[in-house]
Structure formats: structure tokens, C-alpha cells
């Protein structure tokens, strides 16, 4: 039986380490989200009524999704602490993966989401059959839009968001990077391990 290729479980990227979520991340995840609710709620529908049970369900779902290849969720670790999360998600059709990210309110404007996304781009294009990566965000979430722009993604359209955000207008900005364009993503000191 041939194993399905998957991204690395641990990736070091400059000032951050991306690490596949584990069950023992429960307390750190809950704390990071809870401390950042005012920052996350406008843009992340899942943060609306976040509880310990929400965190536990997310971690259990993350393990299942990783196993079936539908989603690869990582904790963003910096200075020894969980500072956010990022994902590669197989929900934009054949040949594509979507990147999602969030960071703790105290960790914004430090380049963590950009570094994490650069690492995920590299991982995505190591997987067979992936020819494009997309980032989709509400058009009013200007901070989120800076990430794909810095990484050389191209805005390819606007569409209604499947899950509108409380702070947004429901219009999703779609950014795309193709395998051929991926050389434009800086190295950011990425090491798999």
C-alpha cells in the first residue's frame, strides 16, 4: 500500500515554528483564542462562541482531517508559545489548496502570518497534483490582505463568502499563486523537520 504524500508535521520558518496540532495543545489554544476574541471575532466566524469544548472539537477534527488529507492544521509557535494557527485546506477544487491563518492579538504586525503562509506555500507545492494555492479573506480585513500581497499572490476575483464575517461585508477577495509563480515567494528561512 502506497502512503499518501502529506506536508511536514514540523516546519521552522525564521522566527516561527509550525507544528501539527496535538491533543495537548488544548489549554494553550484555548488561552490564545480567548485572549484574542475581540481581535478574532470580526473576521473568524468560528470565534463567536469559543469554549474549551470548541477547542477540543477542533483538535479532534484536525487529527481526522490530517489523516484523510482534507486539511492540515498547524499551531504557530514563537518564543515557545502558541501564537496562532494556520491551515492548508482542500476546499477550492482539484489541484488547489487554500491557506488560512490567525494570530494572537499580541503577535500582530510581526510577520508571523506572512512567514507561516510562505512555509505553507512551499509545503503545498511539494504535494503531487497541487498547481495553485489561494488565500481568501473579507475585503474589509485589510490586515489579512497584506499577507498574500507580500508573498506575490495575484488577486483573481471577488466572490460572496460562504461564511460571512461579523466585521466584514461578505465579499471575499481571492488571491492565487500558481506553482509557476511560486518562485516569487521569498525563502523566509524555511526548514522542514
Residue ranges and their predicted role:
Residues 41-60:
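Conserved GNAT-fold acetyl-CoA-binding loop/helix
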Residues 1-28, 32-39, 73-193:
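Acyl-donor (CoA/ACP) binding surface of acyl/acetyltransferases
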Residues 60-75:
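A short helix-loop-beta-strand connector motif used in the catalytic cores of GNAT acetyltransferases and
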Amino acid at each position: 500500500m502506497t502512503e499518501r504524500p502529506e506536508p511536514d508535521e514540523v516546519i521552522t520558518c525564521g522566527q516561527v515554528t509550525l507544528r501539527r496540532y496535538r491533543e495537548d495543545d488544548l489549554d494553550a489554544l484555548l488561552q490564545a483564542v480567548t485572549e484574542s476574541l475581540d481581535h478574532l471575532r470580526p473576521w473568524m466566524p468560528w470565534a463567536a462562541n469559543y469554549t474549551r469544548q470548541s477547542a477540543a472539537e477542533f483538535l479532534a477534527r484536525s487529527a481526522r482531517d490530517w489523516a484523510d488529507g482534507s486539511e492540515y492544521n498547524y499551531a504557530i509557535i514563537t518564543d515557545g508559545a502558541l501564537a496562532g494557527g494556520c491551515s492548508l485546506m482542500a476546499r477550492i477544487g482539484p489541484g488547489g489548496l487554500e491557506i488560512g491563518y490567525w494570530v494572537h492579538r499580541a503577535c500582530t504586525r510581526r510577520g508571523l502570518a506572512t512567514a507561516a503562509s510562505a512555509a505553507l506555500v512551499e509545503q503545498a507545492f511539494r504535494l503531487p497534483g497541487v498547481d495553485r494555492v489561494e488565500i481568501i479573506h473579507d475585503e474589509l480585513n485589510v490586515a489579512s490582505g497584506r499577507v498574500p500581497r507580500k508573498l506575490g499572490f495575484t488577486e483573481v476575483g471577488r466572490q460572496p463568502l460562504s461564511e460571512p464575517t461579523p466585521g466584514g461585508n461578505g465579499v471575499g477577495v481571492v488571491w492565487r499563486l500558481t506553482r509557476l509563480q511560486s518562485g516569487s515567494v521569498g525563502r523566509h528561512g524555511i526548514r522542514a523537520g
